[in-house]
Swiss-Prot record:
ATP binds at residues 661-668. The keyword ATP-binding applies. Keywords: ATP-binding, DNA damage, DNA repair, DNA-binding, Nucleotide-binding. The keyword Transport does not apply. One of its GO terms (biological process) is mismatch repair. InterPro entries: DNA_mismatch_repair_MutS, DNA_mismatch_repair_MutS-lik_N, DNA_mismatch_repair_MutS/MSH, DNA_mismatch_repair_MutS_C, DNA_mismatch_repair_MutS_clamp, DNA_mismatch_repair_MutS_core, DNA_mismatch_repair_MutS_N, DNA_mismatch_repair_MutS_sf. This is DNA mismatch repair protein MutS. SMART domains: MUTSac (SM00534), MUTSd (SM00533). GO terms for cellular component: cytosol. It comes from the Bacteria. One of its GO terms (molecular function) is ATP-dependent DNA damage sensor activity. Pfam families: MutS_I, MutS_II, MutS_III, MutS_IV, MutS_V. This protein is involved in the repair of mismatches in DNA. It is possible that it carries out the mismatch recognition step. This protein has a weak ATPase activity.
Amino acid sequence: MTMQQPIPVPPPDETPAPQAEAAARVTPMMEQYLEIKAAHQGLLLFYRMGDFYELFFEDAEIASKTLGIVLTKRGKHQGADIPMCGVPVERAEDYLHRLISAGHRVAVCEQTEDPAAAKARGNKSVVRRGVVRLVTPGTLTEDTLLDARANNYLLAIARARSSTGGDRFGLAWIDISTAEFMVTECSGGELAATLARINPNEAIVTDALYNDNELGQTLRELPAVTPLTRDVFDGATAEKRLCDYFAVATMDGLAQLTRLEATAASAAVTYVDRTQVGRHPPLSPPAREASGATMAIDPATRANLELTRTLAGERRGSLLDAIDCTVTSAGSRLLAQRLAAPLTDAPAIARRLDAVGAFVADSAAREDIRSILRGAPDMSRALARLSVGRGGPRDLAGLRDGIIAADQVLARLGELDQPPQEIAAVMAALTRPSRELAAEFATALDEQLPLIKRDGGFVRQGYEPALDEARNLRDASRLVVASMQARYADDTGVKGLKIRHNNVLGYFVEVTAQHGDKLMSAPLNATFIHRQTLAGQIRFTTSELGEIEAKIANAGDRALGLELEIFERLCAKALEISDDLRAAAQGFALLDVATSLAKLAVDENYVRPEVDSSLGFAIEAGRHPVVEQALKRNGEPFIANACDLSPAPAQKSGQLWLLTGPNMAGKSTFLRQNALIALLAQIGSFVPATRARIGIIDRLFSRVGAADDLARGRSTFMVEMVETAAILNQAGERALVILDEIGRGTATFDGLSIAWAAIEHLHESNRCRTLFATHYHELTALSAKLPRMFNATVRVKEWQGNVVFLHEVLPGSADRSYGIQVAKLAGLPPAVITRAKSVLAKLEAQDRGQTARALADDLPLFAVPSRAAAEAAPPSEAELLMDAVKALHPDEMSPREALDALYALKAKLPKQ
């Protein structure tokens, strides 16, 4: 995580008045730089100087090191050389991307007046400059700075603390590159899972929250955190700031937000306003996400299941990579959103499954629509760039092509007999954009378009008569230059003479070095004026060439000015219907996800799951979606297995399966595949099985794999225990829990005891659907007294002293782990294997299993409290009062909240 310095309020466009003390010691240009930099501490300042952005002092040293560019110097300040480096304006986005990726933020300072205007104000006048944009990780819009397949979220976190203890958090997250705006409220216990789901690129918090020791570790999990002053998170002015941003009189037209949600939402739009400096990116009204609307998945579970990234940090090999058959960037982003937040509403899931099912059944429609979508642009991001003045001609063309594609998709969808509800909604969205706009854009825009509007040449010939006239004058002058070159070659006798052009010299005459002396000698030197000598060429100008260059420049400037006016006019028309265009873009994304999941289902032989509100969990012939694809690439089959955690006829809660078997037999794969099948079902996807029935899962927990956390001073075993504690403390009846090898990181009996107690707690207290894999075979004895516990094992076969893994899960329990056979396969020396067998034989003679069976008979269940626990004294009144005081954060409380807290504390005092 990168902890950032606060972003200051940007200065006005006009440079502040010079400071007298600085004026005596620095040049006017450096004086201007220092004043602008002082207003933007904590950011690297890109200071525009002609065709370069230049950086000075510490900024230059940081940029030079990060970008690998030359560090030089320019002038002196207080007797010391001023470090300086620069990047070309035309390559600025590439350098910005590298700086942002390295955790830096950048203030972009542009020239806000023409140099000629500065000169007219006086010889010593400096060109006015102002910061036009603050580039931060969460406020990017350019394609070159963004991952096309991922959202780029800015997250605002607001906290409220109660005198009775317990935190509540308001969260608002915005992607200004797509205009998405979401809000929710959660408890402190839900915060980590919610942050992991949103996966923001940048978070903004109050100074107090930034420095909070309790939340420090949670915040450190985020890529970048920026602290802001408390006024940005002022709940009293939150609704007014939101109304101002959306230009509405009241919040009635927006979502009904809680005070905390409104506080976070207003902080987010305030930060967007500050970073865009005068621009006002259009956003969708904040959509409120109800608590519990999505499956809660904590960060450890997301990592263990490798949902979007493998444990090595790669997309390839993740579940997202395995199921992503989308053909558009927007579709890929939507699929990632759904995978991050599986639904918990069965009817909503059914609507998604209906859409996928329609395209599973109609392969021709599926492939036709996918073919159209392949050429569809990313309209949401094109609109975002145009709205903040960073768009180009290709963005306008993208909107044109998007409207044309909408017509093509509508025509094909119209051939469906009975489109499902989700597809019907898409069809309605695709009818909204104006077809007249597409027609005008088609008339106005040329076939070949530049990336940057200032390059010109993007308006079609014949669209604007005044522009055609300016271009003809410019081009006619260029023909004069061509004829001039032929005449100069004849006059000088230098057949290789050329007239060329660059941005520094303008037009110039160029000859090889061997002919240079001829042009610099009489009588030709009266016509040809020397400009530049290079290694192999010498360059000249003439008064005639200077005159024609001025005519070309004037005509070219007029042509470019007219083109830019046309661009702004077309851009304004597009932004007038931005809501309609954005709705169509969302429709494309929905269609892309539905058709891609249908293709996945057909290609990989997936089936439609049954998802309901029961506690059922029955999967027949289930497969791991990622492992199966990997095996298929190698020409190997995947062994499917069933799993049924549904409540037995006489039971109300789901079952707990205890899975035993050797290493390498496939226990972890079996655990993960069932969790992934459930997750796929609840995002609205078909699943890898022959049949699947899933009762809604509200929380998914996974404790699989082993890794330490050296940064936090945690051993592998400690990490395991922390994650297990979270499961035992948070899992409810609707949760799905998968646990692998709990207790393996400590002494045998310690580990066995922990695993034993954990099973009892899951069975008696949590009462959730659970898969528990272990090498402690003694635990199988618990099935005799835990009615909802079921023993299962992974089948193996011994053959000629070796073990063959069959990867079949069957009822029963393993009597051994075959660890020595696995060690032999791994290549341990024969002497070690022989000795290990000898030691194992002696240990097995002690019959640990008999001891475990006796314990199972003698020990009471976990749910029965011990006498010591029953007789434990409750906390004293003084302790309760002290805990309540510790929970208070005065810096975050309004006067009214502080008064309420004081009364609440007084109420806790014993009555006199």
